[in-house]
Amino acid sequence: MSASLLVRTACGGRAVAQRLRTVLWPITQTSVVAGLAWYLTHDVFNHPQAFFAPISAVVCMSATNVLRARRAQQMIVGVALGIVLGAGVHALLGSGPIAMGVVVFIALSVAVLCARGLVAQGLMFINQAAVSAVLVLVFASNGSVVFERLFDALVGGGLAIVFSILLFPPDPVVMLCSARADVLAAVRDILAELVNTVSDPTSAPPDWPMAAADRLHQQLNGLIEVRANAAMVARRAPRRWGVRSTVRDLDQQAVYLALLVSSVLHLARTIAGPGGDKLPTPVHAVLTDLAAGTGLADADPTAANEHAAAARATASTLQSAACGSNEVVRADIVQACVTDLQRVIERPGPSGMSA
């Protein structure tokens, strides 16, 4: 019993250490930026309440190197817009409760209408505009505080941009490959669950298709965010200009990954849906090859191609043996999954050449 507890503790400790190791460098950068922001605003420029500079730096940098520059730009623009709107409402209505409600309504409405492109992604811009407008009314008796907030936001956000774009920009190729791997892992898991369902239909929980679909869509949404951020980093960070063509190739190839997700979800619906027909024996084999090929798509493309070829042969058998409409549809979906998997395996590698 004690030995088992020690093993579990050791495994948990290794997992914690691995999790911390992956974010230790971004956290270190955030800590340095927060300290610099406080030093510049409090010690150099003598702002008595310079707390917003390190706060804005931490909000922009966070514990990950993804989306830092985007958050910094959204925060700076949002703070500036909120201060302008807050000053206008204060000049007309003062700083009473009615003015507070009006300024929040106007700030949120204008921010939603003004949000375009990079600024529109996420809620940072909208929230910062509303918060800044509120603070203008709260500190209306001390106008210098308002402009110090804008200056502190510029310092904190500016330092975040310097660190995330000029000094330590994330590697967009690594970002894209990591997000792609997460999507492939989710696809592999749902295919493996389909294999188990076909082998023993009673072993799978009734709600597993919904949970699997939620995870797939969550990972796909993450890939969409990473694609936008990777393109921005490759375009604006001088240290990453050399990988622009590779980022473009990986970004364009992501469409095949989205098609694979769609095909696999459709396949899961036909296999795990209620009232399905008895499945032919080759279905188990083709699902096994699809799951194995998806799991090896990045680690071993040659082996993944072998599994894809085996799945294609089995899919052809399913198509030729299909007689009812359900079997024909299922065989066509399996063939689409194989085709999409093949395209995903043939992605461009980090050098820009075909993997």
Swiss-Prot record:
The chain crosses the membrane at residues 22-42, 44-64, 71-91, 92-112, 119-139, 150-170. It comes from Mycobacterium tuberculosis (strain ATCC 25618 / H37Rv). This is Putative arylamide transporter. It is found in: Cell membrane. It is a multi-pass membrane protein. Keywords: Cell membrane, Membrane, Transmembrane, Transmembrane helix, Transport. Pfam families: FUSC_2 (PF13515). InterPro entries: Memb_transporter_dom. Disruption phenotype: Deletion of the gene confers resistance to arylamide compounds. May be involved in the import of arylamide compounds. GO terms for cellular component: plasma membrane.
